[in-house]
Structure formats: C-alpha cells, structure tokens
C-alpha cells in the first residue's frame, strides 16, 4: 500500500504488526470494533471549546453560503420536468467504501471515509448506479432513477464549499445492438436537459461530445443533436470531466462574461462491473443546484 510522506512516518511509529492488522489481518467486523473504540475515546476527550474550534476551522464542517429557500424552487422545477420513465429515489448520505475510487475515479483521500467501513456520498450518480445495478440484477429490464442529494468531498486547497446539492439522473439498460440503446438513453436524458436549460437556466446550453463515429451518425439521423452544440472529441480531450465517461458525454454551460459549467453527463461502465454483465449500458447526468441557483437570479433580472 502506498501512502503519503506523513502517513509513512505514522506507520513507522506504530510498528509493522499494528500496520498488518489494520490493513489486512482484521476482518471488517473486527476493524469496525477497534475503530469504534477509537472514536468513543476521542469523542469523550473533546470539550465544548474543542467543538467550536473545530467548527470554525474545519472547512468540511462549514455551512454552504446557499440559502435553502433559494435552492428549493430550483429543485422543485428540476423534479417537475423529470420524465415519467424515472423513479425517484432518496439516497442515504453514505455509500459503499470504494465508490469514489472504482466509480468516480477519485483518490480515496478525496472522499470522506467513515469508521464503519463506508464513505460519504461524493456524487449521487454513484449511489444511483449501485441501486440501478441492484434492480437490474433482480430482473428489471430498464431502470431509470432520479434523485437530489447533498454531497461532500474533500478537495484540498479549494475556496469552494466542501459540500453541494446535486440533482442526478441514471439510466441502466441492456444492449440492444447497433448502439440503439445508447441513442435511446441519450434521447431520454438530453430531451430532459434541453427543457431544463430552457425553463430553469435561461442562458444555459448543452455541449455534446461524441467519441464514437457510428453513434454520431445515428444521433444526427434521429435529430438528437437538435438544439445542442456538438464539440469534436479531439477538441475536448484536455477539459476534465466529473466522471470517466466513454462513447459520448455532455456538459451544461451557462453563458456569460465567463462561461460557467454547472453539470455534465455521459456513458459509464459502472453497471457492467456491478452487474457482471458487459452488455449493460449506463448513462448518468446531473447538475450542481448550488451552481445553478445564481444563474436563475441572473435570468430573473
């Protein structure tokens, strides 16, 4: 196991046997038991002064600057436009340990890990993909899920809030051949986001990038690209995406003096691994409600 210079110093202090036990020898129940003892001991030692000091200084604990009364109407409009195909899901704030690493491609130090062997949700698309995979494995042919959830991340050296409200859609379906499933899912998601851009985010637009030439031709024939800016894949490779997308992806951009990206979406291979079925196709998409709200003010001015 590789670690940081700081963690290497700590491992040297506690010794090889403790390291081996914590990393490998203890089973999950034993490890949770030990960590629970650590948490109880540390919590008992805290004083009210410690609590308020941590609240003032720890960026992970700081409230967002967004007033909930400003987010509620935006979230309501996002829900009102969701197609009937989608089932609403209320996710836990926790997800399986390793979701950020194996689904989002994030390092474990960029998510909040709990002492109970779980992690705090960093992207609702991860939780929806896990739930969609569970439903697909129990016999559902096509699964379309929607949610909004407060997500927390541990970005270092950032002035932004460590948590945000995100609204997400996830679709999982079996491969129909000829990229027909991919085209169907893109139609479903992009129709929704086109409507949202027209009603919720007045100056918003969708930028679509397609890396598969066959799919690009199919989308053009179906009219999927209507009202959408299409970006050549080679011109978009240097811009980072929120998740490791394949085949096709899209961004939601608000025009202004400095264009602002408020969300994105694309095809992922998550459900293929989670369902152990290489024929599964999964499309995810979402926006940061925190990022969207200021642009709804601009539209009202």
Regions found by a protein language model. Name each.
Residues 79, 194-198, 297:
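Generic structural signal for well-ordered alpha-helical scaffold segments
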Residues 2-162:
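Class II aminoacyl-tRNA synthetase-like tRNA-binding/catalytic domains
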Residues 151-229, 239-240, 246-249:
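Extended accessory regions or peripheral subdomains of proteins
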Residues 63-70, 119-122, 178-181, 185-188, ...:
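Catalytic cores of large soluble enzymes that bind and process phosphate-bearing ligands
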Residues 2-31, 218-301:
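A translation/RNA-centric and nucleic-acid-associated enzymatic feature enriched
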Residues 89, 144-148, 167, 208, ...:
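Hydrophobic faces of well-ordered beta-strands that scaffold small-molecule active sites
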Residues 55-61, 167-172, 253-255:
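Short, hydrophobic beta-strand segments
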């Amino acid at each position: 196991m590789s670690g940081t210079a700081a963690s290497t110093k700590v491992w040297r202090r506690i010794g090889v046997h403790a390291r081996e036990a914590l990393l490998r020898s203890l089973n999950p129940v034993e490890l949770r038991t030990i960590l629970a003892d650590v948490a109880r001991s540390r919590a008992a030692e805290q004083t009210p002064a410690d609590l308020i000091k941590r609240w003032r200084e720890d960026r992970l604990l700081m409230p967002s600057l967004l007033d909930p009364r400003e987010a509620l109407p935006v979230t309501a409009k996002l829900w009102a436009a969701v197609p009937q195909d989608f089932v609403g899901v209320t996710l836990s704030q926790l997800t399986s340990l390793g979701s950020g690493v194996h689904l989002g491609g994030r390092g474990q130090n960029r998510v909040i890990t709990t002492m109970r062997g779980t992690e705090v949700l960093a992207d609702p698309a991860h939780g929806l993909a896990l739930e969609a995979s569970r439903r697909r494995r129990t016999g559902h042919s096509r699964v379309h899920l929607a949610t909004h959830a407060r997500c927390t991340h541990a970005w270092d050296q950032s002035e932004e809030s460590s948590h945000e409200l995100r609204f997400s859609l996830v679709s999982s379906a079996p491969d129909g051949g000829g990229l027909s499933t991919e085209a169907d899912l893109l139609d479903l998601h992009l129709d929704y986001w086109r409507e949202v851009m027209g009603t919720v985010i007045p100056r918003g637009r969708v930028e679509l990038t397609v890396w598969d030439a066959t799919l690009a031709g199919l989308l053009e024939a179906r009219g999927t690209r209507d009202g959408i800016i299409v970006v050549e894949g080679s011109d978009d490779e240097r811009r980072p995406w929120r998740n490791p997308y394949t085949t096709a992806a899209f961004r939601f951009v608000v025009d202004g003096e400095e264009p602002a990206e408020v969300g994105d979406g694309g095809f992922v291979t998550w459900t293929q691994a989670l369902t152990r079925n290489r024929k599964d196709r999964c499309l995810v998409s979402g926006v940061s409600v925190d990022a969207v709200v200021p642009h709804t003010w601009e539209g009202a001015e």
